[in-house]
């Protein structure tokens, strides 16, 4: 099949609209069930459902004239009109209690088939029959004579299946009756597909909870459906599930100044494989591991927050305290459960911050490394090898301030290693302008600045992004300190205080702050550059 830009774009849009519709349907079902349980008095069951879904079902309420019983009654009426009998909803189970668990994979397949292949209404053919079908028509008439009741039932079903759709043939002139049929008019399938996708997306936006859904409203798969694990493993899975990031950091790609190479590689590994899976097959399979290294405060964690905001994946924010346990054997079990959960909730992203605290070099400790630490590192390496050999959409994003302390085996599994260096002059100028614009309002306060941004960008060479933010905060804080002095020194209660007027922040004030605020990692810049020349992979 030949690929084109149009095909890829429309395929992605159609798949995204279908996923949105499926997600909204699942949420609506859970809210309907919770509402029905509450109305019928099953309060404990409703509370257990809300606790397991972690969706906050009580924040939503069912619309007027909508409930689960009404929907079931309408389905029964529709089924009776179509098939002249009521549907059989449940049946008595013949299996034992141990085999009563639902077959999730088969049910999921059936739901997918129903979603993708919806039944179309039957249309009565009113075209003139061809000569080749004359014999078949005669046979049908003879059969109808033998079974007249069957013909009535079939006609009734056809009429009830039309759903108000009437089809009539186009009348032709008498001179054109014997002429060859003309080709039909050209149908703009591209326009039809675009309109259908736009209509489905807008309808979902109106019927769902929000136009920009919050990650906290994302419906996660229940741990009870985590097949293949015993009770101990499920307890560990509950521990790891607490680190699934469900809050919206509200960090967009455009909020990150610079880091263009890092943002592009993250999109190649996380965003594009989900949008355009046709392009990422074979040798073009997406990256499974990405290491961001550089001085502190340059935006490594900020980039991970952008991934949690922009990418529609399950985000695991993992630190050393998550996978390190004092109990023997629990650390490697936690690592295994982490990757199993990531596959279960795929597509997902595992963010390992301060990686050197977990994966330092083996065999370099003078007194010998602890056995439990070695087992945990080995399990982490084995699990990452499993990711590289599988087609699961699981991506490992790691950040480190000390890349020279990482184990060589871990570096091999992190396919892309990007230096997040100190910001350039243009980036520093943009940061200063962002934090100290000419006029900035913060509720009741209005701060004015008169800064030469080009001069300040030269003077802040060697400062990281967090250092520049700290300098800007200190420069803005100096006029505010004068307000504190006026408020504290005012003794007379009869006289009113004057209107608050902040002094203008000038270039001299900013330069004075620079003399008292030094960069945090200027001396390590050369060491990062040397390590980059030896281990870079972009």
UniProtKB/Swiss-Prot annotation:
List, as start-end ranges, the regions of compositional bias called Basic and acidic residues.
138-147
Q: Which SMART domains match?
A: AAA, LisH
Q: Which GO terms describe its biological process?
A: cytoplasmic microtubule organization; microtubule severing
Query: Where is the LisH domain positioned along the sequence?
Result: 25-57
SUPFAM superfamilies for the chain: P-loop containing nucleoside triphosphate hydrolases
Locate the compositionally biased regions of type Polar residues: 115-135
Q: Spell out the InterPro entries in the cross-references.
A: AAA+_ATPase (IPR003593), AAA_lid_3 (IPR041569), ATPase_AAA_core (IPR003959), Katanin_p60_AL2 (IPR027497), LisH (IPR006594), MT-severing_AAA_ATPase (IPR050304), P-loop_NTPase (IPR027417)
Q: What is its EC number?
A: 5.6.1.1
Question: Where is ATP bound in this sequence?
Answer: 294-301
Q: Where is this region: Disordered?
A: 94-147
**Primary enzyme class:** isomerase
- Pfam families documented for this protein: AAA (PF00004), AAA_lid_3 (PF17862), LisH (PF08513)
**Molecular function in Gene Ontology:** ATP binding; ATP hydrolysis activity; microtubule binding; microtubule severing ATPase activity
The entry's localization annotation reads:
Cytoplasm, Cytoskeleton; Cytoplasm; Cytoplasm, Cytoskeleton, Spindle; Cytoplasm, Cytoskeleton, Spindle pole
Q: Which controlled-vocabulary keywords does the entry list?
A: ATP-binding, Cytoplasm, Cytoskeleton, Isomerase, Microtubule, Nucleotide-binding
Reactions performed catalytically: n ATP + n H2O + a microtubule = n ADP + n phosphate + (n+1) alpha/beta tubulin heterodimers
GO CC, sorted alphabetically, is: cytoplasm; katanin complex; microtubule; microtubule cytoskeleton; spindle; spindle pole
Q: Which family does the UniProt entry place this protein in?
A: Belongs to the AAA ATPase family. Katanin p60 subunit A1 subfamily. A-like 2 sub-subfamily.
Q: What is this protein called?
A: Katanin p60 ATPase-containing subunit A-like 2
